[in-house]
Amino acid sequence: MHGNSSCRLESLETVQYLLPQNISLFCFDFAGCGNSGGEYISLGWWERDDVALIVEHLREQRRVSTIALWGRSMGAVTALLHADRDPSIAALVLDSPFSNLSKLVNELAYQYTKLPSLLVSPVLQLVSNTIKNKVHFDIYKLSPIDHVKNSFIPALFATATGDDFIKPHHSQDLHDAYQGDKNFIKFEGDHNSARPTFFYDSASIFLFTTLQCGQLLTESTKFTAEQMKVRRKEIRDKKKAE
């Protein structure tokens, strides 16, 4: 699931890592993004309802066995907001979510203006009232950290050490408060930089285990998966050569 000001194309990088594990992907545009209709986004608040509908659709189609959610930034927040109300989700990959929206806004305001939170609060309240009228949700209630205490789904948290937009402590705080089985990966880069290979490899192994893909693979699909691994290496070598 993609971040703010993005679309489903953000998911393309994961294809070469997940398909060899016999893991299919459902990539989509949130409302108000990409080719989807809608005027506003809500940074996870209403997007979780998009996810609920998609999960319901996939289960009704009976073409998948288990379902995991992989999200970055807004997409990771959406996954956390959905997870505590749907414990049947098998796994979560959470790349750079914020822990609390009002906290994030105060941090960004101070970072770019050096204004103390005492001065930011009245402006934030004005913005909150406008959002309530137009988008119909309260930004003060957009707090993923309030949801993780009720989440028990295996989760892989990840953050870039140089992220100056959603700082690494947000992922750390969420990880520390999370109640389910959890892992945490840190890598070099910033909020929107390309993720390193070891992150994708770690996430692939994590999903292969939690989705129990090994129990579903037949000899024919194992052969196909091996071919895909070879092809993935060829793609990497080509990128390095370029």
Language model regions located:
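The serine-hydrolase catalytic nucleophile loop
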Residues: 4-17, 30, 169
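Alpha/beta-hydrolase active-site loop
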Residues: 10, 41-62
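Short alpha-helix in the alpha/beta-hydrolase fold that links the catalytic acid
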Residues: 14, 144, 153, 167-176
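Conserved alpha/beta-hydrolase
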Residues: 15-37
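Hydrolase active-site cap/lid region
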Residues: 81-140, 146, 186
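Short beta-strand/loop motif that positions the catalytic acidic residue
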Residues: 150-152, 157-159, 163
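Catalytic histidine neighborhood in serine/cysteine hydrolases
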Residues: 175-194
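Catalytic active-site module of serine/aspartate enzymes centered on a nucleophile-bearing elbow/loop
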Residues: 197-242
